[in-house]
Amino acid sequence: MPGGKRGLVAPQNTFLENIVRRSSESSFLLGNAQIVDWPVVYSNDGFCKLSGYHRADVMQKSSTCSFMYGELTDKKTIEKVRQTFDNYESNCFEVLLYKKNRTPVWFYMQIAPIRNEHEKVVLFLCTFKDITLFKQPIEDDSTKGWTKFARLTRALTNSRSVLQQLTPMNKTETVHKHSRLAEVLQLGSDILPQYKQEAPKTPPHIILHYCAFKTTWDWVILILTFYTAIMVPYNVSFKTKQNNIAWLVLDSVVDVIFLVDIVLNFHTTFVGPGGEVISDPKLIRMNYLKTWFVIDLLSCLPYDIINAFENVDEGISSLFSSLKVVRLLRLGRVARKLDHYLEYGAAVLVLLVCVFGLVAHWLACIWYSIGDYEVIDEVTNTIQIDSWLYQLALSIGTPYRYNTSAGIWEGGPSKDSLYVSSLYFTMTSLTTIGFGNIAPTTDVEKMFSVAMMMVGSLLYATIFGNVTTIFQQMYANTNRYHEMLNNVRDFLKLYQVPKGLSERVMDYIVSTWSMSKGIDTEKVLSICPKDMRADICVHLNRKVFNEHPAFRLASDGCLRALAVEFQTIHCAPGDLIYHAGESVDALCFVVSGSLEVIQDEEVVAILGKGDVFGDIFWKETTLAHACANVRALTYCDLHIIKREALLKVLDFYTAFANSFSRNLTLTCNLRKRIIFRKISDVKKEEEERLRQKNEVTLSIPVDHPVRKLFQKFKQQKELRIQGSAQSDPERSQLQVESRPLQNGASITGTSVVTVSQITPIQTSLAYVKTSESLKQNNRDAMELKPNGGAEPKCLKVNSPIRMKNGNGKGWLRLKNNMGAQEEKKEDWNNVTKAESMGLLSEDPKGSDSENSVTKNPLRKTDSCDSGITKSDLRLDKAGEARSPLEHSPSQADVKHSFYPIPEQALQTTLQEVKHELKEDIQLLSCRMTALEKQVAEILKLLSEKSVPQTSSPKPQIPLQVPPQIPCQDIFSVSRPESPESDKDEINF
């Protein structure tokens, strides 16, 4: 039944408890199997006494006990031990180790791997036995003669078990090894549990006290107990002899069931005083024999079988009938299970009503026994007419008759009528009603009636009048417990807490309640005065003060001051006491249970009873960050003291502070991070090293041609960037646009060309074309007459300086010019020839001053529309008449000139572009061929470098630069060749 679970039944890791319990007289270590050098995570007191080391000194040392090696330790044995750890094997060794005081001792060392639920080896268990008396590594005077014999005799008498284990040591190597393997197998099957979370397991043939079968069985026993409580008083009072076979069989079956219950009680778990579930068969049997066994056995004797015989003496039959009352002791079963039944509200009400009816039944049996005893006077053999039985017989018409032949009184009411009348009287008396048709007349009857009325008034007032008060007073803690559980369940359901976390919360509440019994310790301590509160706190923390040597020199006042500051917390399995990164603000003492310290998903320490973890606050000035997680493996009781409270006490008791700082040793300091390497990481590094070793390394020397080539490219790029930064180039534009004139006329059949030029860049990377090339470019600009009514078109020519946008050379320049022509097509329709010529005749102001600053070497050569040939008019003086919108927004001071271009010039330009494009392709092909040769030479050199050099290195082949193909552009400036410049130039 879920509500009837009593005890701590949550899954927990009881590995450490099992090892300690099964190896209580052994010395052992636990090492982490997943960290390099297998550091020690736990050592028991036996090993500390055997080696002379403190537990804190042994922690994080190698499980191979390398810190105990000495000069006489066998190297081969050391290697075998390491191989056993490396291969995760089980093995045994005889090894010579040294104690802390450097005393050599022979140990019989057993190594066994511990696996988790995934069958992965996570820990190593190393057990040690002292065999120095049987193998002396050093021969001295004390080991000779009778002294050695006396020591050997004393050892044999004190440790016979050790002798039995070490008997095969003097045999051959084969037999010795076989016996060791047998011990390891026995160790692994019997002693070694798995390191995992698991529910409490019960041994075979043991029944859990809260399982469904045992719950059903308890309810059956409850019903049969009430049957016994009803029938036994009835049979004793009315002196019925079980002549009815059916009733006899039924009573016998009930007796058999109670006998079976006795057997089951020898195999049923129970809850210990600390809330733990006791499943050890020996403890269960001893507990039952000391408590309820005798009572249950007396209540199960078959008294009805004796009464069933015909020729049994009346006295003996009456005696055994009276002994049936002993069966009422079976009500103790109800008392011991009452806390189970009280889990249900309806069951409580039914039990109370049954108790009231059962008391009335018992009183009715007693009332009839009094009347039956007084109705006939055995001395005079006369009937008492004032008895309530005689009055009842007269009232119902069944009077008593005297049988003269037999000399006895006969007749009277039947037994059924007598029982009903007795129960009627007791019920009316218990409920304080009393109709009076059946009334006591004799003194004994009146005295019993008075007692019954007193009991009845108490029962009636208690059960029916104050049921709510009874529950509030008797079961206040239980009601509060169930109220808390209901609130927690509603909270978990409202906020949809995951199932796993919900189970942890419920288990923690149940376990905490079982430990504290619902008592608020702080509330109780607040009621007590200061002195009494300090005494109670010292008593509550007595385990901490008695077990740790750091508190031995503390005075009574110091202990009382510390005890008041201590807090006791209860942790369930899986609870995290510290998270990695949290502030360590408390010092924790483990009183019971076990915990694990996890750093980087590896167990670096296992803490048990008597261990201390936290931080050394008395030596540090700042709060520490927890470097690992501390998680409970089992139900744990921790006594903690906060940092501020501890420092306050230490500051006040300075003498104790020195002793405390010197004697308290932390088993695990959460401030210091443990440096370790995982075995898996080491294996990965080894695999990576082997992989890199097998790979061919491609290393290019400093004087390699490839390095020199890229270094040359880098230098050229730096020089080009430096030259561009020193100069302030200006963009020139050749732009043809249609401009409206004042008279609204338009220029037809002409093309207007705007020519401008910037100052050439004077760097080592570029040079200006010769005047012949410039003149040739100027002669190419000729006037073409438009065909028919063709619209005037303008050609936009960019600067001769080659930019990275690709507008300065070849067919790409023509493409951009045509794009600009299409964009300005709408404006050209409104420009007339007269307007164009008018623009040419205007002389803007300030042209002379501007010409003095900037000189344009270009001149107008031909103008078919104006009839002027070989004009000396400078182009840079004819651009002032245009509107401000025609000027470049970035270069407002650049002068513009206009002249018409014939249509044949466009064809000439196309031919030139075609020729230039062909030259560019040829140049690109030559450069690609040269690059292919260079790459082939590089690969050849690299392949030669990968082979070991046995002879002198071959001379390097110089890189050949392909011949430069002359390429001319109309408005272009050449520069040194480089990969980047080629990329910029050939970007189409």
UniProtKB/Swiss-Prot annotation:
This is Voltage-gated delayed rectifier potassium channel KCNH5. Glycans are attached at residue 403. The gene is Kcnh5. Contains a voltage sensor domain (VSD) formed from the S1-S4 transmembrane helices, a pore domain formed from the S5-pore loop-S6 domain and the C-terminal cyclic nucleotide binding homology domain (CNBHD). The segment S4 is probably the voltage-sensor and is characterized by a series of positively charged amino acids at every third position. Residues 420-440 dip into the membrane without crossing it. Residues 239-243, 313-319, 368-419, 441-446 are extracellular. Residues 14-86 form the PAS domain. A nucleoside 3',5'-cyclic phosphate binds at residues 550-668. It comes from Mus musculus. It is found in: Membrane. A motif (Selectivity filter) lies at residues 432-437. The modification Phosphoserine is found at residue 883. The lineage of its organism: Eukaryota, Metazoa, Chordata, Craniata, Vertebrata. Pore-forming (alpha) subunit of a voltage-gated delayed rectifier potassium channel that mediates outward-rectifying potassium currents which, on depolarization, reaches a steady-state level and do not inactivate. The kinetic is characterized by a slow activation time course and a small voltage dependence of the activation time constants, therefore, starts to open at more negative voltages. The activation kinetics depend on the prepulse potential and external divalent cation concentration. The time course of activation is biphasic with a fast and a slowly activating current component. Keywords: Calmodulin-binding, Glycoprotein, Ion channel, Ion transport, Isopeptide bond, Membrane, Phosphoprotein, Potassium, Potassium channel, Potassium transport, Transmembrane, Transmembrane helix, Transport, Ubl conjugation, Voltage-gated channel. Residues 909-948 are annotated as: CAD (involved in subunit assembly). Residues 704-715 are annotated as: Calmodulin-binding. Homotetramer. The potassium channel is probably composed of a homo- or heterotetrameric complex of pore-forming alpha subunits that can associate with modulating beta subunits. Heteromultimer with KCNH1/EAG. The chain crosses the membrane at residues 218-238, 244-264, 292-312, 320-340, 347-367, 447-467.
